[in-house]
Swiss-Prot record:
A GO cellular-component term linked to this record: DNA-directed RNA polymerase complex
Keyword Membrane carried by entry: no
Name of this protein: DNA-directed RNA polymerase subunit beta
Top-level EC class: transferase
Native source species: Sinorhizobium fredii (strain NBRC 101917 / NGR234)
Function description: DNA-dependent RNA polymerase catalyzes the transcription of DNA into RNA using the four ribonucleoside triphosphates as substrates.
Family: Belongs to the RNA polymerase beta chain family.
Subunit note: The RNAP catalytic core consists of 2 alpha, 1 beta, 1 beta' and 1 omega subunit. When a sigma factor is associated with the core the holoenzyme is formed, which can initiate transcription.
Recorded GO MF terms: DNA binding; DNA-directed RNA polymerase activity; ribonucleoside binding
This protein's encoding gene: rpoB
Keyword Calcium part of the UniProt annotation: no
Length: 1380
């Protein structure tokens, strides 16, 4: 077969061990954030045609605003965004917020009101665009830039609006009786609780206030007692029949009961059922078939029933008995004497139907609607006298007013589902029918029908993403604004104003600022590496406003629930107080329009699994039988086994294959991104997998990233979606490449309005939020063809477009002199020497020159009393050079501050006059390197206030920036020219010219030779005979001119921004930021980990020659403790070790063949081996079809080790590992003989050796080590501060004091508690004594003792210290008191 395919070497090729084909594509990993915010802003939608959601819905809900008299109205028309003033990069550098100005079109309508009739007519309409503050925009990577730092808004999980039924689990009452309750939770508005008490009376509560009988609530809705009873109960009619009663025969009500007395047919008088017999469904059916219509009943059987209607004398209007009254010996004669021979009775048997509502009605003191409304009013507004109008208005506002009460679409959908209603989701308030349905359902629950709700089911919890959180916040801002607008409309002459004059946008802007700046859900982005960024954006938090609190959250909320499957990861959650409250979205999960998390499934049609994918939420999939993704299938897609393991209604079961409706899409759909990156996850204990997923997020980007030999296939997805690696926006040819940018000439998706050139700026040594280094490196060379979506540059922690958090290290599992006790890690010096685990960290230092009362501070090189040596790294402006190597105490920016004038003696004045000595007026406040930090200056930024003269350094930085912009413009212009003139020459060629440049002969046919005689700029002068061609040329000229001017305009705008002064905090004249790159080699005390939760601290770095070595002389890099595996049950690391060993062995084999090919030129053996080991390329294409050059490239890539992918729950098994080891020519045991580096002797037993992917975590000893001699003290207690950040001391705590007491070290202890801590006078004396060379000193009273005395005095206790002196005999003599 012809080798047609080529491989460019820019992608990592992995051998794939997965057996299950991927049917569904994984959604973009940061879609959650982007989709939600796009839906909120709707920037792309036309201003007039936006649907009512997001920002549009907020404006619609607050506007129109009417003034108090109704004489004028302010209407909302539409809104639009202007382009942002600064782009993302400029905002990062200048500490600004990336936002776009929001302009809202408002219409002010003024009415004329006829004083007699009150009729309104429009007098005046004014429309105007009003600026409503800036709205932060989301960057392409799903983050926000607020004051120059990247932030992420975490999505919140909260209880969905709707109705919930629950019981108290028998906790409220000593008998353990279950008290049922229903709660209607709106999106905003009052909560309604309906609950039973221990006496089975039903009560209602509004907003957790005092309870009222539920019948009062129903009366307030306009029902009377009879209507309430007829709504909740059916009726039977008892008809007088001689001395007994005739009752309709109701088989359904009698099912399962015992006949108390004989049952007699009312028509025939025969006994149909004996007393004491059980009424089975079969018996009742037989009676019905025999034609039994009615039974005969006695008065005794009528007693205890309740009347269904009032017993009224219609002539006189006298009410004998009311509906709901009990029939007994006293009341029955009253009914009969009044001449009633038919009595309607409520069907209450106290077994299937309880008398709860009837009893509540009987216990309710309120008789009618007015009483009920007044009662509710008193509960809601205690102390205010109710009137009918105010009570009615308040009751309506509670649940029936769309302004105050909003169920939201979600709430309505949930209510419909739970109560079997069919109401459109536009009805957002409660209805009378809803409340009745809730009470009915609650009573049925009490009667033993139906199930209560599970609050932790994901069908009852929903996600509020950025857009929705922002919408709620903006609504609050607008409501604050609304009050101000109403007041202003009433107080101002409305005829003369424009909408602009009524609006003060500050409250709205402040609400937005407050949300992004200080909301609990707005977090500083975790930017240690690309994985931590992605995970942060996919996080779901149950905390935050309107959510839970750590203290109140119980075990159930935190636990894994069956509905989490495929929606929320059961593994990834923090250890500690937040466990289970902060979760991560599963890989394939997405959030639907109602905020419920959906998971994808494959449809099964006629027993065959199809590739059709449906997304279902937890409410929807409970009714299906769902098979697992790894169920065995036949070739036609049917199930191979008769019974299939499946999930149904939260249980795992075996079901016949015909019952299965759906199947999982992928085995990794149940875990999160971080957990899906752990190979052999299925072989690890869940607790260790949790640590593994959490620790991958803390891996520091290394100097040289290296993708893992043993991956899972998720690595490239994470690198692409996180935005760390740069993907081409459209196809084209690489025109220029250097370390800072890539220029690509586009060849597809060419749009005349867009530039034909894509310039990608690479980030070089930028600081991330966690001080790690963000650095991008190009992967393409000039002339490369690039397709859309190809990776063209690697970022931090990526390697050929794969996530690369650590390095592959050769590991041996064995003890080594006790240096791997308690999970310690022993490293070889080679790792330090070759910079294997070296990382770069970037620290930012900032200094401001302010305008003080005594005069302005100055940034300068001229600093008093500082040697020239200390200034060696500063330029003439007093700012450090880029590239200077600095150490603790070095000056980075020289700064002097004026100090207060101290009175001068006449002699000093004379000297000052003679020598002009000025230096004593200022003090040195330069910024110096903090202790323990060494590094190299990589960047300096200087910011000046508007109108402040720029120094030489600022000018130089500005010139450099403008040159960079000019180079971009010139390159783009050059490519544009080349393309346009190439098209022009094609258009002109072969045509007869009727005009041309000077000296051109008319009528000549144009050829390449003729045209190229003239300079390019003169080609436009040619005019051709053919009108159509001439028209095309003129169109091209117009397009070219437009592109050129657009390019120039863009350049001018950017230059203007660079030259403009910066916005500074008040009082700041100038600010300098210095970035220092610190190289951190690995050293003892650093924390390292594998991907399986196997973490440890480096205990020692051993010379290479002392490390154990293999038979071929290779020394191992890392020695781990074998005891760390069995008890922790993370066997995945051992399988990874073996597979990594096979990969490296295979790589060696391929390397040897590659060398042989370079010598002999025969590529066949190399091709066969690579095809056998890897099989297919990055897009699944067979390697057989690669050309020779591609095979060599691939061999070069796999030389260090073959990369493989073993997806979670569908990866390599033991047999695969053995096969790989055999192919690589290694022992199947995975063990090798090791030799001791110190003696050269072989160890007694064989040792497991292989490659593990090790990570260096962001817990570096350099950041933690800390020492203090003198430093700051706390103001009140005068004790040293604590912590490295405050340059504090070590705490000598209670237990340490016990230790010194136990040793009897009295003087040491006294020092610790006094002079070394808070005895102010004592510490000064100690210092003086040491200076004198004397070592005697006396401890005084600790300051904290004085604080205690003062605190006791503040409690009104008189505490005095008595001065007394011990005389020679040991008795105390009273001293005279010290002078007060």
């Amino acid at each position: 077969m012809a080798q047609t395919l080529s491989f460019n070497g820019r992608r990592r090729v992995r051998k794939f061990f997965g057996k299950i084909p991927e049917v569904a594509e994984m959604p973009n990993l940061i879609e959650v954030q982007k989709a939600s915010y796009d839906q909120f802003l709707m920037v792309e939608e036309p201003a007039g045609g936006r649907p009512d959601e997001g920002l549009q819905a907020v404006f619609k809900s607050v506007f129109p605003i009417k003034d108090f008299s109704g004489a004028s109205m302010l209407e909302f028309v539409s809104y639009e965004f202007e382009p942002p003033k600064f782009d993302v990069e400029e905002c990062r550098q200048r500490d600004l917020t990336y936002a776009a100005p929001l302009k809202v079109t408002l219409r002010l309508i003024v009415f004329d009101i006829d004083e007699d009739t009150g009729a309104k007519s429009i007098k005046d309409i004014k429309e105007q665009n009003v600026y409503m503050g800036d709205m932060p925009l989301m960057t392409d990577n799903g983050t926000f830039i607020v004051n120059g730092t990247e932030r992420v808004i975490v999505s919140q999980m909260h209880r969905s609006p709707g109705v919930f039924f629950d019981h108290d689990k028998g906790k409220s009452h000593s008998s353990g009786k279950l008290l049922f309750a229903a709660r209607v939770i709106p999106y905003r508005g009052s909560w309604l609780d309906i609950e039973f008490d221990a006496k089975d009376i039903v009560h209602a509560r509004i907003d957790r206030r005092r309870k009222i009988p539920v019948t009062s609530l129903l009366m307030a809705l306009g029902m009377d007692g009879e209507e309430i009873l007829s709504t909740f109960y059916t009726q039977s009619l008892y008809q007088r029949d001689g001395d007994g009663w005739r009752v309709p025969f109701q088989p359904d009500a009698l099912k399962g009961q015992k006949a108390i007395a004989e049952m007699i047919d009312a028509d025939t008088g025969e006994v149909v059922v004996e007393a004491g017999k059980k009424l089975t469904p079969r018996l009742l059916r037989q009676l019905q078939e025999k034609g039994l219509k009615a039974l005969k009943s006695t008065d005794d059987e009528l007693y205890g029933n309740y009347l269904a209607e009032d017993v009224v004398n219609y002539e006189t209007g006298e009410i004998y008995l009311e509906a709901g009254d009990e029939i007994d010996e006293k009341t029955l004669p009253v009914i009969l004497s009044a001449g009633f021979d038919e009595i309607p009775v409520l069907d209450i048997d106290h077994i299937n139907v309880g008398a709860y509502i009837r009893n509540t009605l009987a216990a309710d003191k309120n008789e009618n609607r007015q009483d009920a409304l007044f009662d509710i009013y008193r509960v809601m507004r205690p102390g205010e006298p109710p009137t009918m109008d105010s009570a009615e208005a308040m009751f309506n506002a509670l649940f029936f007013d769309a302004e105050r009460y909003d169920l939201s679409a979600v709430g309505r959908v949930k209510m419909n589902m739970r109560l079997d209603l069919d109401v459109p989701d536009t009805v957002r308030t409660l209805r009378k029918e809803d409340i009745l349905a809730v009470v009915k359902m609650l009573v049925e629950l009490r009667d033993g029908k139906g199930e209560i709700d599970d609050i932790d089911n994901l069908g009852n919890r929903r996600v509020r993403s950025v857009g929705e959180l922002m919408e709620n916040q903006y609504r609050l801002g607008l409501l604050r604004m609304e009050r101000a607008i109403k007041e202003r409309m009433s107080s101002i002459e409305i005829d003369t104003v424009m909408p602009q004059d009524l609006i003060n946008a500050k409250p709205a802007a402040a609400a937005v600022r407050e949300f992004f700046g200080s909301s609990q859900l707005s977090r500083f982005m975790d930017q240690v590496n690309p994985l931590s960024e992605i995970t942060h954006k996919r996080r779901l938090s149950a905390l935050g406003p309107g959510g839970l609190t750590r203290e109140r959250a119980g075990f159930e909320v935190r636990d894994v629930h069956p509905t989490h499957y495929g929606r929320i990861c059961p593994i990834e959650t923090p250890e500690g107080p937040n466990i289970g409250l902060i979760n991560s979205l599963a890989t394939f999960a997405r959030v639907n329009k109602y905020g419920f998390i959906e998971s994808p499934y494959r449809k099964i049609v006629d027993g065959n699994v199809t590739s059709d994918v449906v997304y279902l939420s937890a409410m929807e999939d409970a009714k299906y039988h769902v098979a697992q993704a790894n169920s065995v299938l036949n070739d036609d897609g049917s199930f191979a086994e008769e019974f299939v393991v499946c999930r149904h209604a939260g249980e795992v079961m075996l079901a016949p294959r015909d019952n299965i409706n759906l199947m999982d899409v992928s085995p990794k759909q149940l875990v999160s991104v971080a957990a899906a990156l752990i190979p052999f996850l299925e072989n690890d204990d869940a607790n260790r997998a949790l640590m593994g997923s959490n620790m991958q997020r803390q891996a520091v980007p290394l100097l040289r990233a290296e993708a893992p030999f043993v991956g899972t296939g998720m690595e490239s997805v994470v690198a692409r979606d996180s935005g760390a690696a740069i993907a081409a926006r459209r196809g084209g040819v690489v025109d220029q490449v250097d370390a800072t940018r890539i220029v690509i000439r586009a060849t597809e998706d060419l749009d005349p309005s867009k530039s034909g050139v894509d310039i990608y700026r690479l980030q070089k040594f930028q600081r991330s939020n966690q001080n790690t280094c963000v650095n991008q490196r190009p992967l393409v060379t000039v002339g490369d063809l690039v397709n859309k979506g190809d990776i063209i540059a690697d970022g931090p922690s990526t390697d050929l477009g794969d996530l690369a958090l650590g390095r592959n290290a050769l590991v041996a599992f064995m003890p080594w002199n006790g240096y791997n006790y308690e999970d310690s890690i022993l490293l070889s010096e080679r790792i330090v020497r070759d910079d294997v685990f070296t990382s770069i960290h970037i620290e930012e230092f900032e200094v401001m020159a302010r305008d003080t009362k005594l005069g302005p501070e100055e940034i300068t090189r001229d600093i008093p009393n500082v040697s020239e040596e200390a200034l060696k790294n500063l330029d003439e402006a007093g700012i450090v050079y880029i590239g200077a190597e600095v150490q603790p105490g070095d000056i980075l920016v020289g700064k002097i501050t004026p100090k207060g004038e101290s009175p001068m003696t006449p002699e000093e004045k004379l000297l000052r006059a003679i020598f002009g000595e000025k230096a004593s007026d200022v003090r040195d406040t330069s910024m110096r390197m903090p202790p323990g930090t060494f590094g190299t200056i990589v960047e300096v930024r200087v910011f000046n206030r508007h109108g402040v003269e720029k120094d030489e350094r600022a000018m130089a930085i500005e010139r450099e920036e403008i040159e960079r912009l000019a180079k971009d413009r010139d390159d783009e212009q050059a490519i544009l020219d080349r393309n346009v003139y190439a098209r022009l020459i094609d258009m002109l060629r072969g045509h007869v010219a009727v005009a041309g440049p000077k000296g051109f002969k008319k009528g000549t046919e144009l050829s390449n030779a003729v045209i190229s005689e003239y300079p390019r700029s003169q080609w436009w002068m040619f005019a051709v005979e053919d009108e159509k061609a001439q028209g095309e040329i003129e169109a091209l000229r117009a397009q070219y001119d437009e592109s050129k001017s657009r390019l120039e305009q863009r350049f001018m705008d950017k230059v203007e921004k660079v030259q403009r002064g910066d916005e500074m905090p008040p009082g700041v004249m100038k600010m300098v930021k210095v970035f220092v790159a610190v190289k951190r080699k690995i050293q003892p005390g650093d924390k390292m980990a594998g991907r399986h939760g196997n973490k440890g601290v480096v205990s020692r770095i051993v010379p290479i020659e002392d490390m154990p070595f293999l038979e071929d002389g290779t020394h191992v890099d890392v020695v781990l403790n074998p005891l760390g595996v069995p008890s922790r049950m993370n066997v995945g690391q051992i399988l990874e070790t073996h597979l990594g060993w096979a990969c490296a062995g295979m790589g060696k084999k391929i390397g040897a063949m590659l060398d042989a090919y370079h010598e002999s030129g025969d590529i066949k053996p190399l091709r066969t081996t690579i095809d056998d080991v890897i099989g297919s390329g990055p897009k699944g294409e067979p390697i057989k079809q690669y050309d020779d050059e591609s095979i060599v490239r691939l061999a070069e890539q796999t030389r260090r080790g073959v990369s493989i992918a073993t997806p979670v729950f569908d990866g390599a098994v033991e047999a695969d590992v053995n096969e790989m080891l055999e192919k690589a020519g290694l022992k199947v045991t995975g063990q090798s003989t090791l030799y001791d580096g110190r003696t050269g002797d072989a160890f007694d037993r064989q040792v497991t050796v292989g490659y593990i992917y090790m990570l260096k975590l962001n817990h570096l000893v350099d950041d933690k080590i800390h020492a203090r001699s003198i430093g700051p003290y706390s103001l009140v207690t005068q004790q040293p501060l604590g912590g490295k950040a405050q340059f504090g001391g070590q705490r000598f705590g209670e237990m340490e004091v016990w230790a010194l007491e136990a040793y009897g070290a009295a003087y040491t202890l006294q020092e610790m508690l006094t002079v070394k801590s808070d005895d102010v006078a004592g510490r000064t004396k100690v210092y003086e004594a040491i200076v004198r060379g004397d070592d005697t000193f006396e401890a005084g009273i600790p300051e904290s003792f004085n604080v205690l005395v003062k605190e006791m005095r503040s409690l009104g206790l008189s505490v005095e210290l008595e001065n007394s002196k011990v005389d020679d005999l040991g008795t105390t003599a009273q001293l005279p008191d010290a002078a007060e």
